[in-house]
Amino acid sequence: MKFIVSSTYLLKQLQVLGGVISNSNTLPILDNFLFDLDHTKLTVSASDLETTMSSVLEVDSSDKGTIAVPARLLLDTLKTFPEQPLTFVVEDNNTVEISSAHGKYALAYADGAEFPKAVELSDPSTTRIMGDILATAINKTLFAAGNDDLRPVMSGVFFQFSPENLTFVATDAHKLVKYQRSDVHAEKVAEFIMPKKPLNLLKGILAGNEEEVTVSYNDSNARFSFDKTELVCRLIDGKYPNYEAVIPKENPNKLVIQRGQFLSSVR
């Protein structure tokens, strides 16, 4: 198994995927990136069992194969390279040799078959939304989500999809944010609670991204697909509180203030 790839191109993709990897994995194999090579397509995956993300990279190769490479060690190694083509060669002695213009490096690898497979969604519903709109929705709500382990449903963002609009809600019982978009909609009504970690990953990737994101979801999992990248995560199980009950319906008091002045005064 052999392939050639740009050092900066690979590093950029791996740094994004590295955000999935936990510092306290229960399975040692999860400390690795999964490399799945199929000729000129290299699919790289990272997982913590709750969240799995994969990206497809274009490489120069005619081979096929699957290996698991130590994530932190590979990232640290790639950071030392200037932009240049790198040649990866998988040897029979359980090492992968990385050849650069400045020398060769050898990393031990594990059997890719040990890496857990991403969850396949059964009978999912699907909604499409522009990446920058989704990133804005996450930015405007995620900060209000709680951190209380005793109330897990409030530790994420509540997604409400309907044919009329998409609504995103977060609360920690002290503050509440509701963000609604009537310019995008779903084919049918759906509700689910997204955990913080995958939302933080999506927020960073999708900021300013005008690619369309396909959101697929069922009762237990959600999948976000865009631009050769796929993120699958487990949803938070439970019923979200009736947030509408705490939003005043008839409040005669209204204050209009310049945003910049208000921000300066409360800093």
Q: Where are the regions a protein language model picked out?
A:
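Structural preference for solvent-exposed beta-strand-turn elements
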Residues: 1-267
